[in-house]
């Protein structure tokens, strides 16, 4: 999922418990890892999060349901969606896990030169060369207590394997 860097940082600082969208996720994606691409300034895969609930309604309802109606930054949502936007969605986030090392867009393009990271989200399937790279990256660099001993060496090895798989 692509998220502007400013909001991605808030998610991983755990000061933002909801991600607001115009379109909801599919129900099948609830409680699954959703990898976050920090767009705009950063251009990196920063970590993952899970969504436990999808709230839908107009802007006012969603702001109240999430508590953003009393937060100082609640006005940003109204500014973006409009006061009476009828199809506002809020994704309730949990298990937010940042990577020790970020996977850059430049490195992703070494694996898949045609990668397209849309504004909302895209699926990366098992037959995609990036699938195994992201899975290995997650195992090696998730800040969940399982840190690797030599991040630089591990990063190079994961990217090398990804490039080799792409060539096959």
What name fits each language-model region?
Residues 3-25, 41-46, 54-168:
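Contiguous surface segments at macromolecular interaction interfaces
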Residues 26-37:
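Short coil-to-beta transition motif at edge beta-strands of beta-rich domains
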